[in-house]
A protein has these predicted regions:
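Active-site beta-loop-alpha junctions enriched in small/polar residues
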Residues: 1-3, 33-35, 80-82, 113-117, ...
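Acidic-and-aromatic substrate-binding clefts and catalytic sites of carbohydrate-active enzymes
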Residues: 2-13, 83-90, 115-121, 154-156, ...
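Active-site acidic/histidine proton-transfer and metal-coordination neighborhood
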Residues: 11-108, 117
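Gly/Pro-rich active-site loop or hairpin
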Residues: 48-57, 118-172
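Long hydrophobic alpha-helical segments typical of transmembrane helices together
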Residues: 162-189
Length: 207
């Protein structure tokens, strides 16, 4: 994973090979997490949500521009789940998902379960971004201590996410159902894919 925001630096050793593998116009999109894994020389070994403020936004914009220069295209930026509210934030999460694409000129990989889990865990109302959503991820999680939701990609897609998908889907978005373990019978996974496809089809036909 390449660091693109909170440290103010990018990782050329990651982006260089990616540029060599990039097959040009045949690739619809590539993505990176809107997160950091190290700062000040300290590696934390986990995706961490950066402070949602103008300092982070400026560093992110610089690094996205550098990624665009090296690879030729900018990544879609994926929102992450967090169990800790990022300190020093001046934007709400939903505001952040609107200002990041405008500041960087790139699009969002909107992970609906990450946003759903954060909203449940921190008690905010979801306002879905309407601009520059280039890809959508669906996944599931589980309830942990104190009623919080852990985004573990090991459970079925919650019903609420299909309603969110219907609100944000358009004809161009790529939708991916993620599952990283605790696999059910394959037919159940296919049913989630079919449900997502039908949700998008119905939503787009009503525009």
């Amino acid at each position: 994973m390449a660091d693109l925001d909170a440290t103010g630096t990018h990782e050329g050793e990651v982006l260089g090979p990616r540029a060599r593998l990039e097959p040009g116009d045949e690739t619809r999109a590539w993505s990176e997490h809107l997160a950091f894994v190290r700062a000040g020389g300290i590696e934390i070994g986990h995706l961490a949500a950066p402070p949602r403020n103008d300092e982070t936004l400026s560093a992110l914009a610089r690094n996205v521009n550098e990624a665009r220069r090296i690879v030729g295209t900018a990544p879609l930026l994926e929102n992450v789940a967090t169990l800790v509210e990022p300190p020093c934030s001046t934007y709400s999460e939903c505001e952040w998902l609107r200002v990041v694409p405008r500041a960087t000129g790139t699009g969002l990989l909107l992970d609906l379960h990450n946003l759903y889990a954060n909203a449940r865990n921190f008690g905010f109302d979801i306002v879905l971004p309407r601009e520059r959503v280039g890809m959508i991820h669906l996944a599931g999680g589980r309830t942990i201590a104190h009623g919080r939701i852990l985004d573990d990609h090991r459970h079925a897609v919650p019903e609420a996410l299909y309603a969110m998908l219907a609100d944000v889907a358009d004809d161009d978005a790529i939708v991916i159902v993620e599952r990283d373990g605790n696999y059910p019978p394959f037919e159940e996974l296919l049913a989630e894919v079919r449900r997502a496809r039908e949700t998008c089809r119905t939503a787009c036909s009503s525009f």
